[in-house]
């Protein structure tokens, strides 16, 4: 089970990708089921090596068949692969570069529309994930990232939130996800010129995150992650972390919905959120 260091369904098409992502995240924080025997580190690394390769190959196959950017085949794999690389796992640099170029070119081709608040099919959620993925790939700020930043600014609501446009659970269904990712995108690529603007936006976003009810695992995860990124107070972060920890099931995992069973996506993202919040797990 999870211990705090402070006071504190089967998926369609993307299932294997999300499973692999969950495995990468779980490995990063070193968590196993409470009733399991100790996990052999060499075995874990071998599984992760295969998972990273699967992520990269699946993403490569996607761009052979599709011409649109996706969070599940470009952004999330980019983030997971970058984390795997930092953990000392080998990755295919050529495939990583191809994915980054694909994302960059996709939004570059929509520049005129994007910079005026149009041309992003998935809305703020999509733009936020794109910026996070590009940053994970090591992309420097340029006209494409500037346009995505401008897009996100046009979509920020007076109440401090960014709203989800398309509802395709579990990955794409939550205003909390859209809000956290949009804020992160502005932080990663807003630059010094955008610092004052960002400082004016953050308090509204913090307020929305704290006052809006979280109903699903996705909501709770990105509520916590968003508040971390927004520089929330430690007491608030601990309270939200406890809410997540309370949802852990006897098998050691988490579920997406109250009536569901535990799965790798829900479990992996909770562990990521807790680690992001500085909560000791394992």
Segment roles from a protein language model:
Residues 1-13:
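N-terminal secretory signal peptides that target proteins for export/translocation
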Residues 16-28:
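Bacterial N-terminal signal peptides
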Residues 2, 30-282:
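Preference for long, amphipathic alpha-helical scaffolds in soluble/luminal domains
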Residues 5-7, 17, 77:
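Intrinsically disordered, low-complexity repeat segments enriched in small/polar residues
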